[in-house]
Each structure stands twice: as C-alpha cells, then as structure tokens.
C-alpha cells in the first residue's frame, strides 16, 4: 500500500531543494536532550558577518557528521536521523559579541572503537575551513563511558609508576638535558649522570634530539643508560631518563624502543607530532613491555594557543589519556610557556581525575567519567627554577613531574649542584606543607631557611631569585578573571 501523498511530499520537497540551510536539514534541534551515550563537543565559533549563529552551529554539526553542501538522495539509504549530529544549544561568549559557544551531540555509532584518528577525522577534519565561519575552536568534549572503555588508556599510570620507582608523598623531579642540540654522546651522558646523582629522579631528551650527525641515537642511548645505572648505584634510588624514540617511520621507532628496553630503560619518549595512530601504537608496545611512555607535546602551540581558532589543549589532554600516554607536558603557569593558572589546572584535572566535574572557571564544560582508565602523570616544564617551588606545589600538588632544565643545568656551581638545589627545595617545601604551614605565602621564607645549610640552593636563589615570566596569557577562562599564582 502506498504512503499518503502528504507523507511522500515532504521528502520529495527536501530532495528537490538542491541546497538547504543546515538547520532545515535537521542539524539543529533546540529541544534535543543529549543522551548518556552521546559524544558531546563544544565549539567556540565566530560566524561571518550576517550569518545566523544557529545556522553556523548547524553547519558545524553537519560538516562534522553526515552533511555536504547539497542535499543527497542517498541519505534515504541510511538511518540519517540518527547519524546526523545535532547542534542543540548556542550561547554567547561572555564579553565577546562576535563569538558563540555551540554544543553538538553525536551518536556513538558514528565513531570507530578505540581510534583517536577516526574521532579527530570527524570532529576536526573539515569544519575549521568552512567559509561561513570566520574561526572555530574545539573547546571541550565529553565521551560516553561506553566509548571510553574501548580504549586501553595509560599502560602504567601514576600509582604503578610510583610503585616501580618506590617514591611517594612528593612530586617527582626531572630535567631536560641542555643544550638540546650539539652535545656528543659522551658529554650528553655526563650531563645525565650529574643531574641524577644530584637528586633528580629523571633526565630527559628534548623534543628535537633524535639522531643527528653530532650524536647518533644509539650512542646517546648507550651513554645515557650507563649514566642512569651509575647514578642509581651511587644513590640507591631508581632513576630513569626519557629516551626519545621519535623517528621517521614506525618501524624505526619500534627498533629504537626495543634497544632502549634491552639496555634496561624503564621509560621511552615520543613527540606529539608523530600523530595519533603512532601514539596509540607506541602505547600498546609500552603496555606489552612494561615501559612508561612519556609524551612531549611538541607542536601543540600551533593549534592550541589562540583562543579563537584551533583546539584547546584540554581536548588534546583528553585524547592523549584515551590514547594511552603515561606522562604528558601540561604547562607550568609560572614558567616561560603559555598558561593561565586556572586553565592549566583544568588540564591537570583531566589527567588525574577519576571523574572530572564541570568547572567553568577552569575551562571544563562537561562532566567526564573516566571509567577504569589509569591516570596520567602531568609534567610541568619550561622556565621554572627552585625559587618557584612553593608556587608549583601549591598549584599542582604531589602527582606531577617538575622538570627544571635550565634551572638545573644553568646553576652557577654546576649540574649536580643545580639538581641538589631543586631536591632540597622540594624536600623543604613538602616538609613544611606536611607540618601545616602556608607554603604559598611562607614559601620564600621556607626556601631561605633551607638555603642556610645548602650552598647549592642558596646559589640558585641568589641567581634566579623570584624570576617569573609575567606575560598576559592568551588562552584564559571566559568565566573567571585571570588568576595570579602569587
């Protein structure tokens, strides 16, 4: 029996239309109530002059799911009403009349299980160059628990890492070997030994030290692991150094990782620029080989820093936790790199929470249940020194790696003295905190007292004092004034 003519007329009109507005094609539904199984995304959009914000939001939903520029009859061969993403809410951005927050819901069946590459191809693959929108930024996402459970997450996590290192109750300490380029393998190993012997837990390759003419990767691995073993024997502590296995092909990265494992390394490192498939592959390798995976967020500033266009680092942090890294650089707030204190704390929450609660002051727009995924150890690195120890512990607590590169290797008395200065400052601050003192306000006094019996710390404070890089952050909260760390 044929359907009534009125029922047939509606789809016929739709498919005869050629080009329709996205909101008329079903990509806007202001009455939609997101389901627990929906994947949610929040975009900051800047529509072109004269473009309706609701239409712009519907366009984002359409172009990140099933739409193209014209109506296609093959929609009728799919469950198109289910597969269409739905923009369901548009809010003006506070104090910015040109921008709007656009909330979009995606049915879970649009995404492949356990694949960040597939997720990103949909969510950010096409919409950011769409002409009706001047600029777009992916601010936050919420993943349903069913989707989270398709990822293995970090292979080690914070608790297991502390158990392997036998180090509890304080932040971990590290340093990036400097200069990042130009050292021979032997001299590189000497720097690693001095830093670990002086009291650091980790040393680290920088993002662009791979295998250059001045130092082949195999030489670096050999000299570094010799230094790690000697420092461990001298101090009685478990030590490590992040060996960067980033290379031009996955096959070469696996080869370097296997060599690091054969030398007894407990940790390897990769750069963010290797891509999501590579990150997940290396995470799987680390899980199979009981290795810690450290990720340096090289290149992230090209798309995370600008507030009007790109992808917020809180989203990158969520993807990285799903992808399975054990460490990730998340900012310092007080160092040389971009970072508003409240916004950076939001990144740390994403790494360390079992359940992340909505917190607009820290840029967290959604609740996120991380199910059984292990926690990621955040890393604070870039322009920090012993004189900021009280600020760092106040901001980030214990579960963090504090990496003092220049703040160790630039010490006037040498590398080992620089490491000792940082270790003494850390121990003094943790002790004072555990005794109930207000370390944020009393921090300088606590450091000066500790420096009375520690020459390296005294020299560090004399050299760097209370130096901070006080520039106005670019990526700040829209719902709170920029916070001071002092």
From Swiss-Prot:
It comes from Cupriavidus necator (strain ATCC 17699 / DSM 428 / KCTC 22496 / NCIMB 10442 / H16 / Stanier 337). It catalyses: 2 (2R)-3-phosphoglycerate + 2 H(+) = D-ribulose 1,5-bisphosphate + CO2 + H2O; D-ribulose 1,5-bisphosphate + O2 = 2-phosphoglycolate + (2R)-3-phosphoglycerate + 2 H(+). Mg(2+) binds at residues 204, 206-207. InterPro entries: RuBisCO (IPR033966), RuBisCo_large_chain_AS (IPR020878), RuBisCO_lsu_C (IPR000685), RuBisCO_lsu_C_sf (IPR036376), RuBisCO_lsu_fd_N (IPR017443), RuBisCO_lsu_N_sf (IPR036422), RuBisCO_lsuI (IPR020888). The active site is at residues 178, 296. The record marks 336 as: Transition state stabilizer. RuBisCO catalyzes two reactions: the carboxylation of D-ribulose 1,5-bisphosphate, the primary event in carbon dioxide fixation, as well as the oxidative fragmentation of the pentose substrate. Both reactions occur simultaneously and in competition at the same active site. The basic functional RuBisCO is composed of a large chain homodimer in a 'head-to-tail' conformation. In form I RuBisCO this homodimer is arranged in a barrel-like tetramer with the small subunits forming a tetrameric 'cap' on each end of the 'barrel'. Transmembrane segments: none annotated. The modification N6-carboxylysine is found at residue 204. Its EC number is 4.1.1.39. One of its GO terms (molecular function) is magnesium ion binding. Heterohexadecamer of 8 large chains and 8 small chains. Induction: Total RuBisCO activity (both chromosome and plasmid-derived enzyme) is high under lithoautotrophic growth conditions, intermediate when grown on fructose and poor when grown on pyruvate. Belongs to the RuBisCO large chain family. Type I subfamily. GO terms for biological process: reductive pentose-phosphate cycle. Substrate binds at residues 126, 176, 180, 297, 329, 381. This is Ribulose bisphosphate carboxylase large chain, plasmid. Its cofactor is Mg(2+). Binds 1 Mg(2+) ion per subunit. NCBIfam families: PRK04208.1. Keywords: Calvin cycle, Carbon dioxide fixation, Lyase, Magnesium, Metal-binding, Monooxygenase, Oxidoreductase, Plasmid.
């Amino acid at each position: 029996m044929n359907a009534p003519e009125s029922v047939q007329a509606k789809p016929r009109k739709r498919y005869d239309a050629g080009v329709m507005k996205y909101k008329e094609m079903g990509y806007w539904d202001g009455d939609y109530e997101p389901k627990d199984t929906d994947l949610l995304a929040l975009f900051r959009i800047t529509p072109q002059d004269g473009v309706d914000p609701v239409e712009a939001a519907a366009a984002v939903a359409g172009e990140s799911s099933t739409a193209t520029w014209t109506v296609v009859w093959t929609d009728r061969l799919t469950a198109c009403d289910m597969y269409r993403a739905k923009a369901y809410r548009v809010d003006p951005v506070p104090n910015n009349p040109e921008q709007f927050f656009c909330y979009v819901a995606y049915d879970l069946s649009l995404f492949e299980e356990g694949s960040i590459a597939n997720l990103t191809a949909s969510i950010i693959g096409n919409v950011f160059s769409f002409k009706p929108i001047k600029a777009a930024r992916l601010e936050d996402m919420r993943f349903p628990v069913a989707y989270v459970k398709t990822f293995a997450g970090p292979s080690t996590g914070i608790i297991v890492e502390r158990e392997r290192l036998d180090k509890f109750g304080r932040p971990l300490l590290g340093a990036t070997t400097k200069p990042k380029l130009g050292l021979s393998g032997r001299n590189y190993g000497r720097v690693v030994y001095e830093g670990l012997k002086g009291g650091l837990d980790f040393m680290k390759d920088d993002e662009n030290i791979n295998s250059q003419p001045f130092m082949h990767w195999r030489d670096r691995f050999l000299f570094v692991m010799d230094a790690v073993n000697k420092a461990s024997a001298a101090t009685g502590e478990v030590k490590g150094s992040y060996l960067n296995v980033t290379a031009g092909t996955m096959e070469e990265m696996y080869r370097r990782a296997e060599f690091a494992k054969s030398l007894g390394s407990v940790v390897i490192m990769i750069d963010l620029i290797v891509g999501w498939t590579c990150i997940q592959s290396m995470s799987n390798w680390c899980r199979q080989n009981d290795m810690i995976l450290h990720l340096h967020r090289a290149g992230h500033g090209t798309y995370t820093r600008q507030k009007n266009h790109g992808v917020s680092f809180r989203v990158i942090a969520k993807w990285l936790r799903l992808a399975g890294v054990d460490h990730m650089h998340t900012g310092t707030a007080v160092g040389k790199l971009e970072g508003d204190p409240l916004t950076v704390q939001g990144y740390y929450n994403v790494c360390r929470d079992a359940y992340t609660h909505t917190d607009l002051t820290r840029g967290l727009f959604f609740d996120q249940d991380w199910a059984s995924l292990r926690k990621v150890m955040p890393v604070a690195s870039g322009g920090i020194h012993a004189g900021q120890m009280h600020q760092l512990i106040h901001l980030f607590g214990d579960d963090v790696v504090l990496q003092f590169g220049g703040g160790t290797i630039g010490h006037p008395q040498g590398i080992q003295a620089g490491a000792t200065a940082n270790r003494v400052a850390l121990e003094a601050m943790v002790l004072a905190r555990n005794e109930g003192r207000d370390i944020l306000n009393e921090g300088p006094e606590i450091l000066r007292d500790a420096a009375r019996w520690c020459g390296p710390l005294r020299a560090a404070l004399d050299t760097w004092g209370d130096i901070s890089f006080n520039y106005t952050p670019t990526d700040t909260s829209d719902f709170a004034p920029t916070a001071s760390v002092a």
